[in-house]
């Protein structure tokens, strides 16, 4: 009899464990009028990635992504924006991202054509492939000092983007990152850049102010700067001008000036 009682208690405990909120893998919840799907990133933790499921034609204007969400009595921390989370949501004009977000996954905001402003937090470390591709109304975007990884084509065809500054935390600009940014006027690269990928600034013909303070020319491809004005003044460290003049990719430019 005692064995049966112990077994019964064990089965109850197991059932309670299996129903624990931390065993949930995904759930839906609504915040500020927007319905989202939340997926637990690592099993048995309370960190989740968020994806919008409200239909795109019903979501317009400003969107504020929540930093936390409560489901079945458990608080979950929203730490990632999922793959294609808002892709094609062409009515969104402004996006506020909470300070809990560290990763924006691939194509998260792709073709959000009305998006003019994105407020992103300092802890953000990763922007995925093609995350903001085709955000043709986006005029300004500041890469925070916490950014350490950009994905391929992340700002491709952001045709209203006018300037970009790369923080010292970032060592690589990937292929096609700013390809087709036809309004881009200013590029500022700090001292720690190592590589700039194929077609990273392809077709950025409107750039008039280009500064790269990295002493050794970052590794580039022959097409990295293709389509830019070859005669625009490029500011580099005074002691390294000749290195830039002869480096692959950088030899595209004819007008170097020292700083």
Feature locations, PLM:
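Bacterial Sec-dependent N-terminal signal peptides
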Residues: 2-34
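Extracellular/surface-exposed low-complexity segments
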Residues: 5, 19-23, 233-259
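Short beta-strand/loop segment at the start of cytosolic alpha/beta domains
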Residues: 24-55
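Structural signature of tandem-repeat unit edges
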Residues: 40-48, 58-80, 90-103, 112-126, ...
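Acidic, Ser/Thr
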Residues: 53-56, 69, 85-86
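Consensus positions within tandem repeat domains that build extended binding/scaffold surfaces
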Residues: 83-85, 105-108, 128-133, 151-156, ...
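Short, charged, surface-exposed secondary-structure boundary motifs
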Residues: 127-128, 220-221, 245-247
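Short, conserved catalytic or adaptor-binding loops enriched in Gly and charged residues
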Residues: 224-228, 248-251
């Amino acid at each position: 009899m005692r064995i049966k009682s112990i077994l019964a208690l064990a089965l109850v405990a197991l059932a309670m464990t299996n129903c624990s909120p931390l065993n949930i893998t995904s759930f839906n919840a609504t915040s500020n009028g927007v319905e989202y799907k939340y997926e637990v990133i690592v099993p048995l933790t309370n960190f989740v990635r968020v994806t919008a499921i409200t239909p795109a034609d019903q979501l317009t204007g400003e969107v504020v992504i929540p930093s936390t969400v409560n489901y079945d009595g458990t608080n979950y921390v929203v730490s990632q924006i999922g793959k294609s989370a808002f892709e094609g949501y062409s009515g969104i004009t402004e996006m506020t991202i909470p300070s809990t977000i560290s990763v924006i996954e691939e194509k998260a905001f792709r073709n959000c054509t009305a998006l003019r402003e994105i407020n992103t937090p300092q802890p953000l470390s990763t922007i995925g492939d093609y995350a903001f591709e085709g955000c043709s109304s986006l005029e300004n975007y500041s890469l925070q000092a916490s950014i350490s990884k950009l994905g391929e084509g992340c700002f491709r065809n952001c045709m209203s983007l006018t300037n970009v500054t790369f923080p010292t935390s970032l060592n690589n600009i990937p292929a096609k990152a700013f390809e087709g940014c036809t309004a881009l006027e200013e590029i500022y690269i700090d001292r720690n850049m190592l590589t700039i990928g194929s077609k990273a600034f392809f077709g950025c013909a409107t750039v008039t102010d280009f500064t790269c303070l990295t002493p050794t020319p970052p590794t580039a491809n022959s097409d990295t700067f293709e389509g830019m004005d070859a005669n625009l003044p490029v500011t580099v460290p005074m002691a390294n001008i000749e290195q830039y003049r002869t480096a692959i990719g950088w030899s595209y430019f004819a007008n170097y000036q020292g700083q």
